[in-house]
């Protein structure tokens, strides 16, 4: 997942694409935690950024679930 993905950009994605981004971000977080445990992590800030991206994806999915935001193209998913 690219650094700096905004909530607005995430809102333009379909539910399937959001699920894929969530899976990718969780995999990246797992790998970063593993690197930290083995002392190979050079950029500690990346952990925080990835956690924030995961939270943004969950936020967009929850908005759609509650009907607070429409899916891409203005239609509910």
From Swiss-Prot:
Q: Which GO terms describe its molecular function?
A: structural constituent of ribosome
GO BP, one annotated term: translation
Q: Which terms are listed as keywords in the entry?
A: Ribonucleoprotein, Ribosomal protein
Q: Which PROSITE patterns match?
A: RIBOSOMAL_L29
Gene3D superfamilies xref list: 1.10.287.310
Q: Which domain of life is it from?
A: Bacteria
Pfam families recorded for this chain? Ribosomal_L29
Q: Which InterPro entries match?
A: Ribosomal_protein_uL29, Ribosomal_uL29, Ribosomal_uL29_CS, Ribosomal_uL29_sf
Please tell me one Gene Ontology term that the record gives under cellular component: cytosolic large ribosomal subunit
Q: What NCBIfam families does this protein map onto?
A: L29
Family, similarity comment: Belongs to the universal ribosomal protein uL29 family.
- HAMAP family per UniProt: Ribosomal_uL29 (MF_00374)
Q: What is this protein called?
A: Large ribosomal subunit protein uL29
Q: Which organism is it from?
A: Mycolicibacterium gilvum (strain PYR-GCK)
């Amino acid at each position: 997942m690219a650094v700096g993905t905004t909530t607005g950009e995430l809102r333009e994605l379909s539910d399937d694409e959001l699920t894929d981004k969530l899976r990718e971000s969780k995999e990246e977080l797992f790998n970063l935690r593993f690197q930290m445990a083995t002392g190979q992590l050079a950029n500690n800030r990346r952990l925080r950024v990835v956690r924030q991206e995961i939270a943004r994806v969950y936020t967009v999915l929850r908005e759609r679930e509650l009907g607070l935001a429409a899916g891409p193209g203005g239609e509910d998913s």
